[in-house]
A protein has these predicted regions:
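Walker A (P-loop) phosphate-binding motif
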Residues: 1-36
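P-loop/Walker-type NTP enzyme "switch/lid" segment
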Residues: 11-14, 32-113
Length: 114
């Protein structure tokens, strides 16, 4: 990990205020609109709503050729693949991010902890 990422933590003790939605929108804007490398760490145990949403998205892509084509076009237009999501717990979020980035050629400009 040569880059030193900027860490953002989106948190609130109140549920249902849009933390995960904000995290997803921020990650997508940074990644696709600004071309920055982003890692999202979903620490929202036990829901892991960002991980669950990503799994639903991948399931739809596997079953629907129209959406698959749209994703391929997005990748070609932006030159960016989908941003990664790591499942963790609140206590282990920073360690999970660092472990993910330390494995292989992975780098991030921004790490978003939800």
């Amino acid at each position: 990990m040569d880059k030193q990422p900027v860490f953002f933590c989106v948190c609130s003790q109140k549920g249902g205020v849009g933390k995960s939605t904000f995290t997803i929108l921020l990650a997508s804007w940074l990644h696709y609109a600004l071309g920055r490398d982003v890692l999202v760490v979903d620490c929202d145990a036990p829901q892991w709503s960002i991980v669950a949403q990503r799994e639903r998205e991948l399931d739809v892509l596997e079953r629907n050729d129209r959406y698959k084509l749209m994703m391929v076009r997005l990748f070609k237009r932006t030159g960016r693949k989908i941003w990664p999501v790591v499942r963790s717990t609140p206590d282990e979020g920073l360690q999970a991010a660092r472990a993910y980035l330390a494995a292989g050629d992975r780098e991030a400009d921004f790490v978003l902890l939800d």
